[in-house]
From Swiss-Prot:
This is Putative uncharacterized protein YAL056C-A. Partially overlaps CNE1. The lineage of its organism: Eukaryota, Fungi, Dikarya, Ascomycota, Saccharomycotina.
Amino acid sequence: MLTIYKREAVVVQLLRPCYKLTLVHYVNTTQQRTDVVKSTTAAVSTNFRGCSNMRSIMRSNGLGDSLSLWKVVCRFPSLLFMNLRSVGPSEPLNARSLISQVLFPIICASVTFLPT
């Protein structure tokens, strides 16, 4: 699920069976936005480090590792609200849901909201 926020904010909420990570930042300047993107990317990457299944899914679909995916996600800090969840409590996020819940909404959001 991707929700669009029009004010300048970085909101990342990642839900998995074993943990919940929420990061919220409000920024006023370009420099603050850059700092927030860096810290958000680092935090999410650290959180994913022990999740070998997610990393292997990303690699097998040509998405690189978690850090590269979140660098792409964090390029759009003003419209970012990620909510990833498994289909069931013990079922891993599979490639199809990863693409449908993450990449496709980001592409749509970037096309809709990035300045021309």
